[in-house]
Swiss-Prot record:
Induction: By heat shock, high-salt and drought stresses. One of its GO terms (molecular function) is transcription cis-regulatory region binding. Residues 61-76 have a biased composition (Basic residues). Belongs to the AP2/ERF transcription factor family. ERF subfamily. It comes from the Eukaryota. The gene is DREB2B. The keyword Repressor does not apply. GO terms for biological process: positive regulation of DNA-templated transcription; response to heat; response to salt stress; response to stress; response to water deprivation. This is Dehydration-responsive element-binding protein 2B. SUPFAM superfamilies: DNA-binding domain.
Length: 373
């Protein structure tokens, strides 16, 4: 097939139209941010129209319908964020990632306007109210009254509307009313904040008073008063306890205020309590319940190594253990040399080579062991 034939075939064949990718679905045109179809220009146009109808009562008026009540998010059941089903604000819904969005439909059942994304549902509801007042005028259905919207949400919504309306599309009267409502709400918030601050300050002051009361020297002196001696009456009839308590309290206060470096330099801190009574002042003549300290000291000086003397009859007839005997006492029939060997031996007694010692128990004859039984 030559080149001329190909050219002739292309001229004869009709052009082939490509079918759309998704037949039956219309592509919704996007609104530009700055063009005549933007959200800001649309709200501004409706606000000017409402303003003209209010200021010119004799002019031609177009019938306006009140906005629909809505279907309580019937189409959003099971969709959106976790809190979307519990949200009762008009024109507000939650995204799956937690953000809140606001939308409003133009009057006369026209298309919806996207008002923006907000961090809270209240802020989105306030933005919807501002747009509803601008587009529907006195017939607008709002989420909050003009004096019942949260102050923080009003500020966020006003900032969003100002960004959407760079030219100040709202009328002066509407802006003034919204500003007054916001200022009243802010005043309420400030009043509540001031009252909360006052209550917090009062609580802190009460706590500081309690702490200062606990650290007063008078309270410390009363607590530590049982450690002091009973008050003595002077010759002129005055009480000596006053002077002692003042001195004692000053010592305690100085002890508490003294830095740790001062205590380290002195080697020890000041004595908070009075010195203990000496041993010589202990009660005497208590019968068998007390002991003689002088006698105990004399005994310790006479026998510093606690060996003692063994006194008594050397023939073993008087076998009573008494302090001051000449030699130690042994049981009758027991070999003293064997006991000394047992005590001086390095090996245990059960490892010794003489098993007869365990049988006889150290006695010369078994009859001596069973004699006293």
């Amino acid at each position: 097939m030559t080149v001329d034939q190909r050219t002739t075939a292309k001229a004869i064949m009709p052009p082939v139209e490509m079918p759309p990718v998704q037949p039956g679905r219309k592509k919704r045109p996007r609104r530009s941010r700055d063009g005549p179809t933007s959200v800001a220009e649309t709200i501004k146009r409706w606000a000017e129209l409402n303003n003209q109808q209010e200021l010119d009562p004799q002019g031609p008026k177009k019938a306006r319908k009140a906005p629909a009540k809505g279907s309580k998010k019937g189409c959003m059941k099971g969709k959106g964020g976790p809190e979307n089903t519990r949200c009762d604000f008009r024109g507000v819904r939650q995204r799956t990632w937690g953000k809140w969005v606001a939308e409003i439909r133009e009057p006369n059942q026209q298309s919806r306007l996207w008002l923006g994304t907000f961090p809270t549902a209240e802020a989105a509801a306030c933005a919807y109210d501002e747009a509803a007042r601008a587009m529907y005028g006195p017939m607008a259905r709002t989420n909050f009254g003009q004096h019942h919207a949260p102050a923080a949400s009003v500020q966020v919504a006003l900032a969003a509307v100002k960004c959407a309306l760079p030219g100040g599309g709202l009328t002066a009267s509407k802006s003034r009313t919204s500003t007054q409502g916001a200022s009243a709400d802010v005043q309420d918030v400030l009043t509540g904040g001031l009252s909360a601050c006052e209550s917090t300050t009062t609580t802190i002051n009460n706590q500081s008073d309690v702490v200062s009361t606990l650290h007063k020297p008078e309270e410390v002196s009363e607590i530590s008063s049982p450690l002091r001696a009973p008050p003595a009456v002077l010759e002129d009839g005055s009480n000596e306890d006053k002077a002692e308590s003042v001195t004692y309290d000053e010592n305690i206060v100085s002890q508490q205020r003294a830095p740790p470096e001062a205590e380290a330099s002195n080697g020890r801190g000041e004595e908070v309590f009075e010195p203990l009574e000496p041993i010589a002042s202990l009660p005497e003549d208590q019968g068998d319940y007390c002991f003689d300290i002088d006698e105990m000291l004399r005994m310790m000086e006479a026998d510093p190594t606690n060996e003692g003397l063994w006194k008594g009859d050397k023939d073993g007839s008087d076998a009573i253990l008494e302090l001051g005997q000449d030699e130690p006492f042994y049981y009758e029939g027991v070999d003293p040399g064997m006991l000394d060997n047992l005590l001086r031996s390095d090996e245990p007694a059960w490892l010794l080579a003489d098993p007869a010692m365990f049988i006889s128990g150290g006695f010369e004859d078994d009859s001596q062991f069973f004699e006293g039984l």
